[in-house]
A protein has these predicted regions:
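Conserved, well-structured ligand/cofactor-binding cores
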Residues: 2-193
Length: 193
């Protein structure tokens, strides 16, 4: 696969060289944006956790971190696609039949993608925090970096959920994931106590 757009016209960010992704992120285009950055942050955090687990002889944790990375990384593109559908819904003529419903549906979908990022990120934060405490001490810095990146990704994703759906269960659930990540980070910082 190349970094070029698929059927949706959105590039496969996972196939882009990092420099090109960063250029795209800083361009004047609406996507990639915060959702893609949050997904990539959580994916990098999971990668660090997997590395720390492997070098700590914690194979099960490494496998779980790999699975989380593979689950969250494609959400970078999914978020951009969902945002594109929001923009398309808002471009429908005002007063047209079904416009309001299409906007609400698109916003709901746009909230669902970062909610999934937040869920995954909270688990990555717990896993990386555990590795910082119990893993190979030579890799504590990598595990801590993973936990902090994961928490940042969770917080960013939760903000996007609330931006798209400020009221309702999804916003509350996103806040719970932020709280879970915060607790995991604090537990790690306190040495597990």
């Amino acid at each position: 696969m190349s970094g070029r757009g698929g059927a949706s016209g959105i590039p496969d960010y996972l196939q882009m060289p990092l420099g090109r992704f960063l250029e795209a992120l800083s361009s004047g285009e609406p996507a990639p944006g915060g959702g893609a950055a949050a997904a990539v942050s959580v994916a990098m955090a999971a990668g660090l956790a997997a590395m720390a687990a492997r070098l700590s002889s914690a194979g099960e944790l490494a496998e779980r971190a790999d699975a989380l990375r593979e689950e969250v990384a494609p959400l970078a593109r999914a978020d951009a696609e969902a945002f594109g559908r929001v923009l398309a819904a808002y471009r429908l003529p005002r007063g047209s039949e079904g416009r309001r419903e299409r906007i609400e549906e698109a916003l709901g979908e746009a909230a669902g993608v970062p909610l999934e990022m937040a869920r995954i990120g909270a688990e990555v934060c717990r896993l990386a925090g555990r590795l910082a405490l119990e893993g190979n001490p030579n890799l504590k810095g990598d595990a801590v970096a993973g936990a902090l990146l994961a928490e940042a990704g969770v917080r960013a994703a939760a903000e996007l959920v609330e931006a798209n759906e400020p009221e309702g269960e999804r916003a509350l659930e996103a806040r719970r994931f932020v709280e879970a990540a915060r607790r995991a980070r604090e537990k790690m910082a306190q040495g597990g106590g």
